[in-house]
Every structure is written in structure tokens, then in C-alpha cells.
Amino acid sequence: MATAELTAAFARLDRATSTAELVQATQAIASLQDPEAAETLIKVLGFNNPAVASVATEGLIRLGCAVVPKLLVNLDARNYGARAWVVKVLATLRDPRGLELLEHALQADIAPSVRRAATRGLAELDLNNSRDADALRRCCDGLLLAGRDDEWVVRYAAAF
């Protein structure tokens, strides 16, 4: 159940009519660091507003790996901007549960920004505690694929 502070922050977001108000409302939600805010922060990624999405992304990253399952099931397949932000969060969190989504994004997404973020995610996935050689192989295969991508930003992400 959402706290009174979180409920008030959600209401502030709903009332926002400008970018500045959206940023402030999203900052208020993110600052609470409440896991119940994750779905709203994910929804904000789809507002097609980079300033707001950046704040929401940082809020999701601060929530940590606990948000990974919500990221995996709330991906907006019709909004490449939102997909890019979600993939960026997954890449930053380095959680191996994102492997399948990162692979799919690299192989099938039309947007170079999504493929680039997926490439970085595959390169930086935290497999140190994993004894899963298959996951490491899949990451390497993905990076090799990214190295042959038509877009230089994706190839660059694979190389560096």
C-alpha cells in the first residue's frame, strides 16, 4: 500500500502540465525511494520527454535490482524511447535476469539507441557470481553481433 507521501507525489504527477512540473513531480516520487513507485516511474519513461525520463531512470536505478521484474514485464513495445530508457536501467543495474531482454533488444529492435544500450548491458552484465557458462557465451555472442551492426553507435558500444 502506498504511503501518504507517495500518494501525494502521484497526484502531483497527475496534475503536472509542464515539463518543469513533470520533472519536479518525478523527482518527488523518485526521492521517496519506495519500490511501489517503480511502475509509475516506468510509465513516466514513455512520456516522450527526455528530462522527465532521465529523472525517472535515476529513480529506478536507485531502487536497485528489486525493480528488474517490473522492468521486464512493463516494457512498452510500441515506444522506442521508453524501451531505450528501460534497457538503460537494466544495463546499469547489471542484473543477469535482464539477459533475455537485452539479447532480444540487440537482435530485433529497430532503434539504434535501444540496441546501443542493450550492447552496453550485455558487456557489463554481472556474471561474477554466476556459474552459468551459457550466460557468458550468450553475452559474448551478442557483443559479436553488435560489432557487425549497421549503426556505428552500436558497434562502438561493443568495442568500448
Language-model features, listed with the residues they occupy:
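Core helices of alpha-solenoid repeat scaffolds
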Residues: 6, 38, 68, 98-99, ...
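Structural detector for internal amphipathic alpha-helices that build alpha-solenoid repeat scaffolds
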Residues: 1, 19-34, 43, 51-66, ...
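Hydrophobic secondary-structure block in the mid-to-C-terminal portion of proteins
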Residues: 138, 142-160
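Short, Lys/Arg-enriched, disordered terminal segments
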Residues: 1-4, 11
